[in-house]
Amino acid sequence: MDVFLGGTCNNSEWRDELIPLLNCDYFNPVVDDWTEDAQKLELQKRIECDFVLYVITPKMTGVYSLVEATDDSNKRPQRTIFCVLTNDDGNEFTESQLKSLEMTKNLIRNNNARVFDTLQDIASFLNYMNLVPN
């Protein structure tokens, strides 16, 4: 079983915190040089991985990960996992951003995708799913 680690980049360390907790394979799309080949590989892995995870943190500068998460929650809800971390190395969302993100979480949850609030909860779920026979 494998998971695509999508979501906030911008020197956010959530992936560094989550990866040691995982007992499954993963694809980390973060690269030093974002090329057309890297983009193609990311799209391929989003399709191939058993789960696609989107972790959103206050270090987010663009909104495309939110679009991807919403799209995947519509097209592949059983494979989509979404999480909003409200603090990232001292950075926090504004109250207005939090309201929008809460609405996004509700939309994704209503699409029957999984929504978690902590990296530990994500790891527990993925590790459990890794033990379940296909």
Residue map of PLM features:
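Conserved catalytic or regulatory cores that recognize and/or transform ribose-phosphate-containing ligands
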Residues: M1-N134
